[in-house]
Amino acid sequence: MSMENSPLKYQLLVAMPQMADPDFEHSVTYIVEHSSEGAMGLTLNRPVQISLGDILSDMDIEIEVPPSERHRVVAGGPVQQEAGFVLHSAATRWHASIPLSDGLILTTSRDILEAIAIGEGPEQSLICLGYAGWDAGQLEQELVDNAWLSTPASRELVLETPFEQTWHAAAARIGVDMSLIATQAGHC
């Protein structure tokens, strides 16, 4: 399969109910990159106890305007948890911004956090600490093993859906009610 137009890039992966890995149980992960070399995603619904204000203080960024609740912080995945990735929908005027899909933008440069601290950043954002990574062929095998559902992403689901509703809402986008799926298959 050619990965140039990967069907998984910019999709949401919804963990199936039987997912036992605590990093991904009931998770929804936005696939930022997918190629023959592997995949990278950001988990959207794993809130952390650290606030954006704490992150800004740790980075010695002076806060002039306290960040609103519309700037949420999550554990983006188990890889490089000290790295930050900002998903947002505002213009790409920051140093390291990549347009994704449905008006979403990914920024990895410090200047977006500095802009948020002075009230000039995007209106809302999801700050992801770390990311989810898959080696070549690993994600494809997990899909074959029925570990994930794939569903289209939307800006609203990524940035606005309450964390506790994200898993069910993402599955519902393709008509799946997760409460009706068994965690184990029976064998006769």
Swiss-Prot record:
Q: Which SUPFAM superfamilies match?
A: VC0467-like
Q: Which GO terms describe its cellular component?
A: cytosol
One Pfam family for this entry, by name?
A: DUF179
Similarity comment text for this entry: Belongs to the UPF0301 (AlgH) family.
Name of the protein: UPF0301 protein ABO_0112
What is the scientific name of the source organism? Alcanivorax borkumensis (strain ATCC 700651 / DSM 11573 / NCIMB 13689 / SK2)
Q: Which InterPro entries does this chain map to?
A: AlgH-like
